[in-house]
Design a protein with these regions (language model features):
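Charged (often Lys/Glu-rich) extended helix/loop segments that serve as interaction or gating elements
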Residues: 140, 149-273
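Acidic, glycine-rich loop-and-beta core segments that form the ion-binding/anion-interacting portion
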Residues: 96-156
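Glycine-rich beta-alpha junction loops
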Residues: 36-40, 85-89, 119-123, 158-160, ...
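Short glycine-/acidic-enriched loop or helix-start segments at secondary-structure transitions
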Residues: 23-24, 43-44, 126-127, 163-164, ...
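General structural feature for long, well-ordered alpha-helical segments within catalytic domains
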Residues: 1, 19-22, 60-63, 67, ...
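Active-site-proximal beta-alpha core segment in soluble small-molecule metabolic enzymes
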Residues: 1-114, 123
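Short, glycine/charged-enriched secondary-structure capping and boundary segments
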Residues: 26-29, 47-50, 95-96, 130-132, ...
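Conserved beta-strand positions
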Residues: 14, 83, 117-119, 154-156, ...
């Protein structure tokens, strides 16, 4: 994969000292980015935190001197530094903190022209929740950057795509057990695995009952043979019936691309308008 990327002229980011040790000839006299673990992990769930000792990503700062020396010995230049703290972060100050951590190691890499601060810009998932403040992040980064002559890169990812998509599914059955009211829909974790995988919250709306009083508390589940096939827990919705159309919001990112045919269930069809 490294060879194919280099042959295609792809800008290569290395996040493991082992690769440089194992294949020095491959990286000889190259211009490279390094992905660093700045030990500043944040995220909406522990499974999406991508920095710190519990994350597999990035070169630990304790190995950075060895990496720099090895690259110098094979005539390679580090022209960019990259880090990604995690996903679903609403606090703009996280990126300022990350930039300041970059600046602590920057004197050791005089050829660096780019600082890539990664992605993870959060998307509001509940009604009334404040969104990510891009203007504040801009102010914080410019203030921290000062007169430093480098490019700042960001990878907005889900921030751009999440709100552009929804999941639609019909109610197939209803069931009550004690105080729990189950609302079954025609698809589940095979189409949207985020709730089951890391407890992601998605707003759910009964499009067939718009304007009706939301006086029923439902657990919304799919048809997959897993107790974890839950789309939403404890949601107040109008009393629903078989055939009602349910909308699950913010599925434009990490929805269809993470779907599967698990349990031989076809995932929801994707329509692009």
């Amino acid at each position: 994969e490294y060879e194919a990327a280099l042959a295609a002229g792809v800008r290569l980011t290395v996040d493991n000292y082992w690769a440089i040790q194992a294949w020095p000839d491959l990286f000889e006299r190259r211009e490279l980015f390094l992905r660093l673990d700045l030990d500043t992990g944040y995220g909406h769930h522990r499974k999406v935190i991508t920095s710190g000792v519990d994350s597999k990503f990035g070169i630990s700062l304790e190995h950075l001197a060895d990496v720099r020396a090895r690259l110098q010995s094979i005539g390679s230049r580090v022209v960019g530094l990259h880090a990604h703290t995690g996903s679903g972060v609403i606090n703009a100050d996280v990126w300022r903190e990350q930039l300041e951590r970059f600046m602590e190691v920057l004197p050791d890499f005089p050829d660096v022209r780019v600082l890539d601060l990664g992605g993870g810009l959060g998307v509001p998932d509940r009604r009334g929740q404040a969104g990510f403040d891009l203007e504040l992040m801009d102010e914080l980064l410019l203030d921290a950057l000062g007169d430093l002559d480098v490019e700042l890169w960001l990878e907005p990812g889900r921030y751009l795509a999440a709100e552009s998509g929804v999941l639609l599914s019909r109610v197939t059955q209803l069931k009550s057990k004690g105080q729990c009211n189950y609302l079954g829909i025609a698809t589940g974790m095979n189409s949207l695995i985020r709730p089951a995988l890391y407890g992601a919250y998605h707003e759910v709306v009964n499009l067939s009952r718009l304007g009706s009083s939301a006086d029923m508390n439902y657990r919304i589940v799919g048809p997959i043979c897993e107790s974890g096939d839950v789309i939403a827990e404890s949601r107040m919705l109008p009393a629903s019936k078989e055939g009602d159309i349910m909308l699950v919001a913010n599925t434009g990112a990490y929805g269809r691309v993470m779907s599967s045919h698990y349990n031989r269930r076809r995932p929801a069809e994707e329509l692009v308008l």
